[in-house]
């Protein structure tokens, strides 16, 4: 994950690590008609006050691939650093958004409720930090589990921090001298920091428990859940994969790789209230809840910003984290986000989806993240101002 090596590694994950396949099982592919619009020369003001354009912006913000969809058509699609339309790229935490979509499908089928207790479905976590925790608190990261996700620790990859050890157990880093216990067993060693449902605190391992719950209620491995409930029904074009830990459990919080077109298709389902090609692939109520959220999620997020994030936090004016999406403006724009610059950005007023892969030189650089979203907004302004 360390630059500059991540520029190659992020689209060669299966060559470096053990993965499990995700497939649409030979089903039909959802069409993405093309209506190219020349965006190269659109100009906008960069974060430093200078004038830039779309083409320069993409190169200066370490873009690997991007697919812009407007009114259901691809209007711009580009690849850099050896990628092409069939290349897979690591999604990082946009994987969480995929996991949440599979959760929405399972809830829609009546396999569980969002307010079910985790330990009722998965008694293997009884006696851990998840006692009394609901599925809602897991997916919204308001569970009380004690885990510090400090990406500054990446500067010391040989440390014995819980984050680095977690990444060894997940398969992101070599195990070294650590015993192979896997991410689920590793999770059971975490203590509880606070009552559930009181504050948002971003901790990736929580999403793995959601995946385990989905395995239990569906009776199949998590990568097969994704194949059946996301890849097949959404009409994905390219085979995907997901990193697995030493015991074979998928890293549902960040280990998935797919093509940028398929990530755009995923965003289209959320833009279109859960419908792809006239077929409902996600419950409309789940999509609506994702983009609108609720006061509990907003209040938990506000407490996080006030108490932990500080004034420089890039999301200090955002609404909330809900159903594994970052809601930037309630009911208007929301995004799946992954470290090092992965985006599935949905802008409802303009009917736009932007799927983007990047390899930022650090995990969460405020300037590059803010610059990227600034570029998205410049594209939207151009698209909506064009005559129809």
Model-derived features with residue positions:
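Active-site helix/loop module of the DD-peptidase/beta-lactamase fold
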Residues: 90, 108-151, 189, 205, ...
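Active-site Gly/Thr loop motif
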Residues: 237-241, 291-353
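Active-site SXXK
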Residues: 72, 90-115, 138, 210-214, ...
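N-terminal leader/targeting segments and the immediately adjacent pre-domain N-terminus
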Residues: 1-84, 111-112, 139-140, 144-146, ...
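Short, charged, amphipathic alpha-helices and their helix-cap/turn boundaries
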Residues: 73-78, 119-120, 155-196, 220-239
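Active-site-proximal alpha-helical segments within enzyme catalytic domains
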Residues: 141, 206-213, 255-275, 342-358
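Short, small/polar residue-rich loop motifs at catalytic or cofactor-binding pockets
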Residues: 60-63, 87, 94, 339-340
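Structured C-terminal helix/loop/strand segments within mature extracytoplasmic catalytic/sensor domains
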Residues: 333-388
């Amino acid at each position: 994950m360390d630059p500059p090596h991540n520029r190659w590694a992020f689209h060669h994950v299966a060559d470096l690590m053990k993965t499990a396949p995700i497939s649409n099982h030979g089903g039909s592919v959802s069409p993405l008609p093309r209506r190219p619009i020349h965006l190269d020369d659109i100009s906008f003001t960069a974060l430093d006050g200078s004038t830039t354009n779309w083409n320069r912006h993409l190169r200066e913000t370490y873009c690997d691939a991007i697919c812009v969809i407007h009114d259901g058509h691809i209007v711009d699609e580009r690849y850099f650093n050896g990628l092409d339309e069939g290349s897979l790229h690591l999604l990082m935490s946009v994987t969480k958004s995929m996991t949440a979509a599979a959760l929405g499908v399972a809830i829609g089928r009546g396999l569980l409720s969002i307010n079910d207790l985790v330990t009722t479905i998965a008694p293997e976590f009884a006696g851990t930090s998840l006692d009394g925790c609901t599925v809602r608190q897991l997916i919204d990261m308001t569970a009380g589990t004690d885990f510090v996700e400090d990406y500054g620790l990446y500067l010391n990859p040989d440390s014995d921090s819980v984050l680095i050890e977690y990444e060894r157990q997940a398969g992101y880093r070599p195990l070294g001298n650590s015993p192979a216990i896997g991410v689920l067993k590793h999770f059971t060693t975490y203590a509880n920091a606070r009552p559930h449902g009181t504050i948002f605190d971003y901790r990736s391992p929580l999403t793995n428990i959601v995946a385990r719950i989905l395995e239990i209620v569906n009776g199949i491995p998590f990568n097969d859940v994704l194949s059946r409930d996301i890849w097949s029904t959404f009409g994905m074009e390219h085979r995907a994969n997901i990193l697995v830990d030493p015991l074979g459990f998928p890293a549902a919080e960040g280990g998935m790789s797919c093509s940028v077109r398929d990530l755009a298709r995923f965003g289209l389902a959320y833009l279109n209230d859960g419908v792809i090609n006239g077929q409902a692939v996600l419950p409309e109520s789940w999509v609506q809840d994702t983009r609108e959220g609720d006061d509990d999620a907003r209040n938990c997020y506000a407490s996080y910003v006030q108490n932990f994030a500080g004034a420089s936090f890039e999301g200090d004016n955002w609404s909330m984290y809900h159903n594994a999406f970052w809601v930037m403006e309630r009911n208007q724009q929301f995004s799946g986000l992954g470290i090092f610059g992965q985006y599935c950005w949905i802008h409802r007023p303009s009917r736009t989806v932007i799927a983007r892969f990047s390899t930022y030189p650090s995990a969460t650089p405020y300037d590059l993240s803010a610059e990227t979203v600034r570029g998205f907004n410049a594209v939207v302004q151009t698209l909506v101002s064009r005559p129809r």
